[in-house]
Amino acid sequence: MAVLAVGVSACGNDKSNAIPEQLCGVAITPELTAPLLPDGDDVKTEPQSPRKDEYAQCTVSVGGKAALYIVEYSGQNSFDALEHARDASAFRNPQKAKGVTNAVIADGKFIAVTPCGEGKKSHVLDIDMNMPSSEAMDLRDELERFATSYLPVGKKVIGCEK
């Protein structure tokens, strides 16, 4: 996985040092995760279900408060992510994500539906930010960068990519 180097801001606030290098059993780049989390040092991944070959769900919390919800499914039927987002009330201002053929970025939400291995079934990655959409809309680019970085590694961990 490529590591993105990010400089410390002028304020000297580099919270990426407090972020573990794995979230939900998936190796991540802390610098891509940092903008999505509130300030705080106590970053924890709390599995909501045991990671299995076809399903994983966890919550990333900071200071005991949920910040991100990450859910992965494999072995799913494919569907159009943008059509799904337009039909679901949870997606605010959905648009096609860059760099992933069937993915949507919205205010505080990302979903991607991609092939799972060589079979006809699909992998679904669904990420929700636990913050008001008015705040999350300013973090769309950061959420998209995190999610597109997480996606291929998550697919390997869940068994879609060998």
Segments predicted by a language model, with ranges:
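C-terminal motif of bacterial Sec signal peptides marking the signal peptidase cleavage site
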Residues: V6-A10
